Amino acid sequence: MGSELPAAAPPQPKRSTAAAAVARRRIGRELWQFWLDPPPYCRPGPSPVKDHFHWEVVIDGPAATPYAGGVFPVDVWFPYDYPFRPPKLFFKTKVYHPNIDGKGRMALDIFQDNWSPALTINKLLLCFVSVLFDPLLDRPTNRCIAKQYKHEYEAYEEKARAWTQKHSSTPIVSHYPPYAVIGSTPPAVPHFPATAARRKAAASSASGSVSSSRIPLLMKDESIWRRTMKFFQG
Amino acid sequence: MKFGAIYEEYLREQQDKYLTKCSHVEYKRLKKVLKKCRVGRSLQEDCPNGDQQEGNNESPDICKCNSCTLCDQMFFTELTKEASEIAGCFSSRVQRLLNLHVPSGFLRYIWRVRQCFIDDQQIMVQEGRMLLNYVTMNAIAIRKILKKYDKIHGSVSGRDFKSKMQTDHIELLQSPWLIELGAFHLNCNSSDIDETVGFLKNEFFKNFSCDLTEARPLMTMAISETMKYEYSLTCPICLDTLFNPYALSCGHLFCKGCACGAASVYIFQGVKSAPPEAKCPVCRSDGVFAHAVHMTELDLLIKTRSKDYWRQRLREERNEMVKQSKEYWDSQAMLSMGI
């Protein structure tokens, strides 16, 4: 893979074997569900899942975004008292995005205060892809990138595309176990509203006074995925 | 036969016998209000402004059709009141019935002695069926009247009211007590009881079935050929079949261990000892743990239908409870010694 970040396992608290067994059973069910019906643009990682508490997932860059064509491996670490504590998800490669920090973490409130045991890894990955497509600019992790996204969208797009090309262009083949029932592959048509295309269309329809480098964000046009995020955040 | 006639006949036959003091939907009266509204609408469309004004003065009962204040007042306040009364009546009656079926403590011994002389099982099954009819009939009546409201007014207020009923936990067919009653029905059907007991002439309630062998365990209630309700028996936390299930006051079902874990309390302390700020893991409503209800009939159903799974879960929960109580008393001892 491109330039990978060190993915150290978060320290696990001492828990009873019974609690770990409950967590293992739940993770097993989620893993099966993930093989059966993965969220859009998500698929299993290249190596087989040996430890239930550590997975590898691959997110394919959504079409009509600067991340299109990119292959983003994600490390998923489950705590031993899962689902009562949230899992930790890290991007293993560098991603140029307002909500992703240098360590590859995406700071969403569903990983902190708004975590609910009823949330599954499929829902979390759906959030990841959603935010990858449509950044949450009200609480950015990387303020410089957020500022650039707001005011110099084309420069942001160019840099994000360059980073994707540099760090996340190595193809990854998913590993499915022989007994897994593989669900339908994600369709080629993007599941998400084409944010970039929408923004460009809005810019072209607007009067000539608006420069192409300073395209305003369409805050009124709230996408379905933003609404999904709001639902998850309670 | 129209639903109105079926409903009236049902009220005549059943209300006096079994469900005295129980509230019901005033279907006929609400329908009359809608009829007046329709007449008012046609008058407003036909008459010019002056005539319309006179018409309004003559009959203040006819609703002013653009705002439909009369309908809104009559309808939604009345329906909310009726639905909450029906829900309350239904839950209390079901509770009373199930306390007789699965008694606890000293009542159990009294019940066993009583069973030597009187067989109340058939009467209980009959009452269970009556309650099922009561709740389904009223739910359909509410559904029909809201549909009619939307049709006459060309609005979606009825649909909005339906969703409001769900958030207020007065949606009759989403009640956890209905699941309990269904479990009771299935538990009684599994024992040898005369099936002909308590069937109605115009019975809407046809079938209650439960499948725990599938990947998604479900309980299905078929009111008619077209109306089917499915109740998931999967815990949203452990993603497994419910074990020792509890219904929070928002109506969501969880295993006892899962609910305690979500509320950050020890299993032996129980679901009700959860702090008031603890939220439901599914809908995030707070203060829902205080009035949590143990679903005894559903637990009994799962216990009888999947014995091996139930035993395995029981073993696991006991181990976890022992471990937790040891941890708790260790911490208490350390606290008392000032460590």
Curated annotation (Swiss-Prot), chain B:
One Pfam family recorded for the sequence: zf-RING_UBOX
GO MF annotation: an example: zinc ion binding
Top enzyme class: transferase
Keywords assigned: Metal-binding, Transferase, Ubl conjugation pathway, Zinc, Zinc-finger
Pathway the protein takes part in: Protein modification; protein ubiquitination
GO annotation, biological process: protein ubiquitination
Domain of life: Eukaryota
PANTHER family named in the record: E3 UBIQUITIN-PROTEIN LIGASE BAH1, E3 UBIQUITIN-PROTEIN LIGASE BAH1-LIKE-RELATED
Record-given protein name: Probable E3 ubiquitin-protein ligase BAH1-like 1
Species this chain originates from: Oryza sativa subsp. indica (Rice)
